[in-house]
Amino acid sequence: MTIIKSEDMSNEEYHARRAVGSSSVKTVASKSLAHWKGQVRKESHAFDLGSAVHAMLLEPEKQLVIRGPETRRGKAWTELKDEADTLGKILLTEADYDLANSMTDACMNNNMANHLLTNPDLLAEASFFATDPDIDIELKTRPDGLLREAGIVLDIKTCQDASPRGFERAVRTFGYDVQAAFYMHVLRLNKVRVDNFIFVCCEKDSPHVTACYELSEMYLRHAHNRMMATLVDIKQAQDNDEYGTNWPDLGTIHLPAWMDSEAAF
């Protein structure tokens, strides 16, 4: 079993490994090989806020988030940022720190989220690596949380709309179904029990409503097939060093079915 726990591998070290991860698969499945090949990993205000909420929920005992000055400008921020980076911690402005705390508190007030995140069996931010035996491609994954005995994978999502309809749209837009299928596939290659994948979704705006969702068995089967087909595309692109879009030179945009009645007039 190829497992490297977070204590043994930092997030930066994980991302430096050249194996294919879930973000790569999501990009290819939802956009193209060209988008994946040309993408640059970015860090931003929103990225830091999301990382802080993850750290507060999954590893609160490590106190990985630092409350910084009012703004990101000036000497005070620069000095604290250098110190935080050295310590492997996340520096936030005063407002963002308070926002992350509010989101964390709201999330933990959700009964299901609290039950999952306070489980003593929770393994947070562990890295897993495997080689797919059929495609011969190196894979990696770093799930937010894993309840090993229960066979449950947890994924924290900070979002604009945690309602059933809103999150359903987000699943389609951002490829969360492919992400879930990929995580489950790599974990199973590592002989890890995986029976379910649960998204813990917390809204960014007050009152930070939180909801938990799972994908249906049919949805996961469909996502698994799509994910495996995407891995084949990635492997072929790597072997041939060809990363195109597969888009036509001249495409035709057709009238959506829901607009047919309008066109009749």
Model feature map: region roles:
Residues 57-61, 158-161, 188, 235, ...:
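Hydrophobic/aromatic-lined pockets within catalytic cores
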